[in-house]
């Protein structure tokens, strides 16, 4: 068992040595080994609860000292924001418990100063949010332990069980199909964590992403009839919209979509080359169809198009040769199809010669003779505009009219 005392702990998410634990999904585990795993988890979780309670007391005391100091507390020009000077913060940290010192290493303090950008001070709201998210991560970690594989990972199925156990019951208005909701929420989480094709994600990545906190805030907003949070993807309303789109496209009512079904997705704005590739990069089932999870991947990629996960997804679709390079031939092929199949409502004077479009897109992505790699695509700030131009007529028109 680990002996990570709060005073010595550097990481907020310690893990049990892997030599002690085997993955739950290992079918070779005996009943004794499974019982042993559960017991280790229980003891570990109880120790973590004690640590969290102590950290919460220390954090509240720290914030109270920050808030109560009138000499070094600045209120900003508008009188709305509260700031603490670096000098004062350093003095307070000197006498703070080790857990608080670990919370604010030098690089974190430096980043907060840059974000605040006001006379070498830190906006106290940043400190409050940091404490809130760390406490939420710690408490979520304890709740996740019984569902995790070995204290470090959790599978998609176990995370669905976790959502069903801890989130569905607190919804005032439950989704009509909780199983689909958990699949939707977990599918979104796995996609945004870049784990679309993986069975498990690391708990540290899950908690660092704050996606579970966003899920909780969505439920809180709907329960209390508040405005949806900025990231509203986990609201029941958004889930219903996605499920309704899926059911509308499911022509055979089998819970699966064929390539022809996606022709009607969002009024048919996505070109056929693009939508067919979705089936080539996803797990398919009967007659090459995709299920709700693959559809959620697609919808999430569109909703969060400025994320790394979405950029990777679009690169994979546009890489027609599946060789890890996006070259001029592929761009020409997709752009030619896109330009030749624009909707009828697009004026003819907005049409562009495919060669001109290819040259413009090539310059946009700084394409070399061999093409560009995924890493180069991710590093290019225009990748979202590029992907939109090649995938759907709406983004194509926005780009063409950008100077009007």
From Swiss-Prot:
One of its GO terms (molecular function) is protein phosphatase 2A binding. Disruption phenotype: RNAi-mediated knockdown causes defects in spindle assembly characterized by kinetochore microtubule instability and a reduction in centrosomal microtubules, a decrease in outgrowth of microtubule plus ends from centrosomes. tpxl-1 recruitment to centrosomes is reduced whereas microtubule-depolymerizing kinesin klp-7 recruitment is increased. One of its GO terms (cellular component) is protein phosphatase type 2A complex. One of its GO terms (biological process) is protein localization to organelle. The keyword Cytoplasm applies. Its main location: cytoplasm. InterPro entries: EF-hand-dom_pair, PPP2R3C. Transmembrane segments: none annotated. SUPFAM superfamilies: EF-hand. Keywords: Cell cycle, Cytoplasm, Cytoskeleton. Gene3D superfamilies: EF-hand (1.10.238.10). It is found in: Cytoplasm, Cytoskeleton, Microtubule organizing center, Centrosome. It comes from the Eukaryota. Regulatory subunit of phosphatase let-92 which recruits let-92/paa-1 complex to the centrosomes, thereby regulating microtubule outgrowth from centrosomes and mitotic spindle assembly ensuring the stability of kinetochore microtubules. Part of a complex consisting of a common heterodimeric core enzyme, composed of catalytic subunit let-92 and constant regulatory subunit paa-1, that associates with a variety of regulatory subunits which confer distinct properties to the holoenzyme. Interacts with rsa-2, spd-5 and tpxl-1. This is Serine/threonine-protein phosphatase 2A regulatory subunit rsa-1. It comes from Caenorhabditis elegans.
